[in-house]
Amino acid sequence: MQQAVARVFGTTVNVDNQTPDFFVAGDFNGDDSVDLAVLVKPAHRRLSEINSSLANWIIQDPHRAFVPPKNQTVVILPPRTEPEHVRSGQLLLAVIHGFGKERWRDQRARQAYLLSNAAGNALASARPSQSLQRDFGVFSSQRDVIAEQLGGSHGVLYWTGAAYAWHPESSRKRN
């Protein structure tokens, strides 16, 4: 897992393994290849590389992701927002999309995201809940979601087809 993070992000981030559940694997984007999500922090003096417009990853806040209205055939996209920037010491969730038979371990697996305001506790791979499917609509393919505790709330991170988005879930039932 450390090798995959180093392969994709080089020396710009460090794995934060302070909790027992600091990483999780699942097919988060629904392409039948297992992906990896792992807690990381920016490496000392590497913020300019992390935040570079030429970086090989996308920095995103799932709380600000555009989620198209369900069951609507024509959707008007919102105006573009300013790019997200990583701050010193910020805990992030790095997601590496898998590729081929080796999945996230494949040397060619390079599609990656750094998710801000999304690094929680109790990371787990789960199936989309009925609540998420009711709010988002039917997913175009089977996929997993990243279930977690974030700021005292239980919720999931899910792939919309263009970005990762946050969906709060009931704390009583975990799917």
Where are these predicted regions, by residue range?
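Beta-propeller-forming repeat regions
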Residues: 1-30, 34-175
